[in-house]
Design a protein with these regions (language model features):
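Asp-box/BNR beta-propeller blade signature and adjacent active/binding-site loops
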Residues: 1-398, 402-426, 430-431, 452-454
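Beta-strand-rich interaction surfaces with strong enrichment in secreted/lumenal proteins
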Residues: 243, 461-467, 510-516, 549-550, ...
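Short tryptophan-centered beta-strand motifs in secreted/extracellular beta-sheet-rich domains
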Residues: 475-477, 519-537
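Extracellular Ig-like/FN3 beta-sandwich strand-entry sites
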Residues: 470-472, 519-521, 557
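Secretory/extracellular carbohydrate-interaction modules
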Residues: 435-513
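Flexible glycan-contacting loops in extracellular carbohydrate-active proteins
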Residues: 544-577
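Extracellular carbohydrate recognition and processing domains
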Residues: 325-333, 508-522, 546-552
Length: 584
């Protein structure tokens, strides 16, 4: 963020709003925005923030609008939008408002750049066609910190797939050059997959970040388990070969925000979808679907993450959940939001702008039922411990299972694009150790169990909990195991709590049973060391056993997954409290 724009935002704050902004630490919801995240946010030179999009009334009637905030996103006012530019990037060095459009508002035959030196509401901005090929998923313009170069990214489609494109100008948008990169690697059919993911036309949606003078990094969406990246050391003219990154995420879109002090903020979905089933035994799919053209159902778009780099992207801290899909547990997930909410209901896709006092405003998600604006303090990503006592219920864990509902993969169903309805894999129940006396402190705790039910795609009950990433640390869970066993998994990414392969695909996993621990609440503690590939397990500080790591971990541990995976039905386990901390 340009420091003049940061200063302008700060000057608009009253003492009361300044105090409110400074008091925010953990991510705080501030708006349901009018458009899916990617390029809705724009900052004016006087510090106002706009969010452009479409308002839909209860009858399905749509109208262009923008929301405007005069206090760094703490509150918003809606306006009807009849402007031409809409979302823009302001270039202070030129006093220019600039954007790119394709396949919208009649500009369907190529890629167009719009700019104005008068203001964002200019009714007659300059318009020029810069490429004859239509593009999609355009990201906002960025201005180099080291030169007059401006650039943006998009993707174009041919008969093979979506290709990543980088467009740049050295004269503030008067003329443009562009580079098209090759296709990235695709998912291969390797067990536990028995069918193909969405691997053709899943998008590249390239995200660009300037690391230093002439050095750029591109983070690219694809169908494998990880994002791929490539770098340019000549300002974007030529690019390296693709390399696999330490950012997990399948068929989702990331965002990189260079900060005014040189740090970089990364936003993405550090998630793993369920293994693909044999699509030839699945109803409602076309032959193209079965070969990996388009998706059947998304199972990794319910958790959003953030990390921060102090060294130009060489290493990252945090790996923290910043938001969980508010409808992730809905049994009518496909219908949540009503008849006009037919699209994806996810919290993938991101945009962010820097705010004063070390805060950021984050846009994330798709569909009005799921998408949000958040304000977060960057210090949140440097925390080294976390505690969960479930006083707020299941707000801070993922626990949903999937029903054998329609998936809406081909748009034939009335609602729910590429979605399955959900079922709770954990519930809040009375603490079974409460003595029942009135006036005696009592509370509810989490119950997870396994129940064979032919309505479910997998019967495993569990919870998935995030904490600050570390390579060496301690995690504990206060549990009451009522029958059979409970599986513990430490992982470097989010898994569905109903995924039976979460343990085998993670660095550390083990089970404890009723022979290992007493029939009362016991604190199971795991001390792990990623570099040593070894973990120690204790029950109420009594050593139980070692666990050897099963694979290399490029980042660190940031997840505890508790699952009831026994044979047949089980009464399961109660969970009262979770704790995690880094060990230096």
């Amino acid at each position: 963020m340009n420091e003049n724009l940061l200063s302008a935002m700060e000057k608009r704050l009253t003492p009361e709003y300044e105090k409110m902004l400074k008091n925010i630490n953990a991510p705080k919801e501030v708006l349901i925005p009018p458009q899916d995240a990617r390029r809705t946010l724009s900052v004016l030179p006087d510090g106002r923030i706009r969010a452009y999009g479409i308002d839909t009334d209860e009858y399905g009637k749509k109208r262009w609008v923008y929301y405007e905030s005069e206090n760094c996103g703490l509150s918003w006012q809606i306006h009807y939008d009849d402007t031409v530019l809409q979302e823009f990037t302001y270039i202070p060095e030129k006093g220019r408002y600039i954007t790119a459009k394709s396949c919208e508002k009649g500009y369907n035959d190529g890629l167009y750049v719009f700019y104005s030196d008068k203001g964002p509401d200019d009714p007659e901005p300059h318009v020029q066609k810069i490429w004859d090929v239509p593009v999609g998923d355009i990201f906002q313009f960025q201005k180099s910190r080291y030169s007059d170069r401006i650039f943006f990214t998009a993707q174009h489609m041919d008969e093979n797939d979506f290709y990543p494109d980088i467009f740049y100008s050295d004269d503030f948008g008067e003329t443009f050059s562009h580079v098209t990169l090759p296709l990235q690697p695709k998912q291969e059919l390797v067990y536990p997959h028995k069918g193909y993911r969405w691997r053709y036309f899943t998008g590249s949606e390239p995200v660009l970040c300037e690391l230093s003078r002439d050095t750029l990094m591109l983070l690219i969406r694809n169908s494998t388990d990880c994002f791929f990246a490539c770098c340019s050391h000549d300002g974007g003219l030529t690019w390296s070969d693709y390399e696999k990154t330490g950012f997990y995420g399948t068929a989702t879109t990331a965002f990189l925000l260079p900060l005014s002090d040189g740090r970089i903020l990364s936003l993405w979905n550090n998630t793993k979808p369920l293994p693909e089933v044999n699509h030839y035994r699945q109803d409602g799919l076309t032959d193209e679907n079965k070969l990996g053209v388009w998706e059947d159902a998304f199972t990794n778009r319910d958790a959003a993450h953030a990390a921060i780099s102090d060294d130009g992207g060489k290493s990252w801290k945090g790996y923290r959940e910043i938001f969980l899909n508010p409808i992730r547990n809905n049994t009518d997930f496909r219908y949540a939001g009503g008849r006009f909410a037919k699209g994806d209901k996810s919290i993938h896709q991101f945009q962010a702008i820097e705010l004063p006092y070390g805060k950021v405003l984050i846009a994330l998600g798709q569909n009005a039922i799921s998408r949000r604006f958040l304000i977060m303090d960057l210090a949140y990503l440097y925390e080294t411990s976390r505690k969960e006592d479930f006083i707020d219920g299941l707000n801070n864990v993922s626990s949903h299972m999937y029903l054998k509902s329609y998936n809406g993969a081909n748009g034939a169903e009335p609602n729910g694009h590429c979605q399955w309805n959900r079922f709770p894999g954990a519930v809040m129940m009375p603490d079974p150790t409460w003595d029942g006396k009135i006036g005696t402190p009592h509370r509810e705790v989490v119950l997870i169990r396994k129940t064979d039910d032919d309505r479910l795609r997998t019967p495993i009950g569990g919870i998935t909990w995030n904490f600050p990433m570390s390579r060496k640390g301690k995690v504990s869970a206060e549990i009451l195991l009522t029958e059979k066993s409970l599986r513990f998994t430490l992982s470097d990414r989010w898994f569905n709590s109903c995924d039976k392969y979460a343990g085998s695909l993670s660095p550390f996993t083990f089970e404890v049973d009723t022979d290992d621990i007493a029939s009362e609440f016991v604190t199971v503690t795991i001390r792990y060391d990623v570099d040593a590939r070894r973990a120690e397990v204790y029950a109420d500080e009594k050593f139980l056993f070692f666990v050897d790591g099963t694979r290399e971990v490029p980042t660190g541990i940031s997840y505890l997954i508790l699952q009831c995976v026994t044979d047949g039905d089980s009464k399961g386990a109660y969970i009262r409290e979770l704790r995690a901390e880094r060990i230096d």
